[in-house]
Amino acid sequence: MTRGRVIQVMGPVVDVKFETGHLPAIYNALKIQHQARNENEVDIDLTLEVALHLGDDTVRTIAMASTDGLIRGMEVIDTGAPISRPVGEVTLGRVFNVLGEPIDLEGDIPADARRDPIHRPAPKFEELATEVEILETGIKVIDLLAPYIKGGKIGLFGGAGVGKTVLIQELIHNIAQEHGGISVFAGFGERTREGNDLYHEMKDSGVISKTGMVFGQMNEPPGPRMRVALTGLTMAEYFRDEQGQDVLLFIDNNFRFTQAGSEVSALLGRMPSAVGYQPTLATEMGQLQERITSTAKGSITSIQAIYVPADDYTDPAPATTFSHLDATTNLERKLAEMGIYPAVDPLASTSRALAPEIVGEEHYQVARKVQQTLQRYKELQDIIAILGMDELSDEDKLVVHRARRIQFFLSQNFHVAEQFTGQPGSYVPVKETVRGFKEILEGKYDHLPEDRFRLVGRIEEVVEKAKAMGVEV
């Protein structure tokens, strides 16, 4: 067993010197274990990951926990292998940290449980599967305009407080109830309270038995926040490759992965690139995203919340992620301010699955007509603001009336928000969604008040709400 000594501590980055000829490999895990000898010292059980070889038999490492109490001269042991974590059935219903240690107070994982390294190559080109199958979410705006692909990568883009985490929680709820497969939730750099709430909600709903969770909260050093994504992905890969399962991987929040990388990048001695991000941003993102894919054995469908700093989509962090995604769901602050939830922008959200050969001709035509109507309404808004509705042609007035009904009908109540809104959530099958919007476009509901279309599920609910108001249907 190779031993070394700590020679420098710079926050989360630690330099370790080894004997000549015994340098550990990149990504190897190193251990520091120290028992306090007096009240001024603290017990230390720290894992480091080798990031750089500096020369002169010295390596630069990233700490996977706080470096409080670490001093120069402490002994370091090379484990001879990368960080590994438990995988398989023993991980379901449990919550782990980046090292695969349980943090849910439910007892230890069996010592003989299989452990896989978190650093692994992406599947080979010939192993990949190329069939396209739609994943129904029960959320109208997504299923109609930016449908998700089974085994695809989906990004939920939005600034602070527009509903990314709530949307992810609703997707977990809907897909777990309808799809019933195995889910992995990787939460990093986000609020501990949200993770705790999510765990207890999943426990109460019974979904937790089919879910493995791994957390690296925002109070932790950048090391665990940077590696938790790989830890969660390793859990998902086992179920895909060894059991042939279709796995759902939820990531909240992808931006924090990049942010943690930029925190340690300068300390590792790298020259920062645009906006202070690490120069290896595209490489790190590619290494993560290329492992999330479908193979002949099974699939991993990943749904990733991605924070957009200051609502700027040209920021390098969200911009680098775009090229890897099959579908994007863009959350718009203006829609949230109008009380339209989920605040998904129907014109900015995209999906490569929105094609007639994949979703069918009727679905495609209805979706495109909805987008055309909303786009025309957007163009007319400046005229309306200056001259008012009276100056519009009869045709444009009709477009505006229908567009407003469509805009409101794209909203719906969520199951996971029921405790806040007091309104029951709704799951709408794709066929019902397409039928509802088709009938609105055909003018079947032009006579109903537009506010009745807000926060409902199926189109029949609009009719019932209008009847309750005394409107003739």
Curated annotation (Swiss-Prot):
Molecular functions (GO terms): ATP binding; ATP hydrolysis activity; proton-transporting ATP synthase activity, rotational mechanism
Membrane topology: Peripheral membrane protein
Top-tier EC class: translocase
Assigned GO CC terms: plasma membrane; proton-transporting ATP synthase complex
One family name in Pfam for this protein: ATP-synt_ab
Record key words, sorted: ATP synthesis, ATP-binding, Cell membrane, CF(1), Hydrogen ion transport, Ion transport, Membrane, Nucleotide-binding, Translocase, Transport
Keyword Cell membrane annotated: yes
Reactions mediated catalytically: ATP + H2O + 4 H(+)(in) = ADP + phosphate + 5 H(+)(out)
UniProt subcellular location: Cell membrane
SUPFAM superfamilies: C-terminal domain of alpha and beta subunits of F1 ATP synthase, N-terminal domain of alpha and beta subunits of F1 ATP synthase, P-loop containing nucleoside triphosphate hydrolases
Enzyme Commission number(s) of this protein: 7.1.2.2
Top-level taxon: Bacteria
Predominant localisation class: membrane
Binding site for ATP: G158, G159, A160, G161, V162, G163, K164, T165
PANTHER family assigned to the protein according to its UniProt record, in alphabetical order: ATP SYNTHASE, ATP SYNTHASE SUBUNIT BETA, MITOCHONDRIAL
UniProt subunit comment: F-type ATPases have 2 components, CF(1) - the catalytic core - and CF(0) - the membrane proton channel. CF(1) has five subunits: alpha(3), beta(3), gamma(1), delta(1), epsilon(1). CF(0) has three main subunits: a(1), b(2) and c(9-12). The alpha and beta chains form an alternating ring which encloses part of the gamma chain. CF(1) is attached to CF(0) by a central stalk formed by the gamma and epsilon chains, while a peripheral stalk is formed by the delta and b chains.
Role played: Produces ATP from ADP in the presence of a proton gradient across the membrane. The catalytic sites are hosted primarily by the beta subunits.
Family: Belongs to the ATPase alpha/beta chains family.
Name of the protein: ATP synthase subunit beta
Protein encoded by which gene: atpD
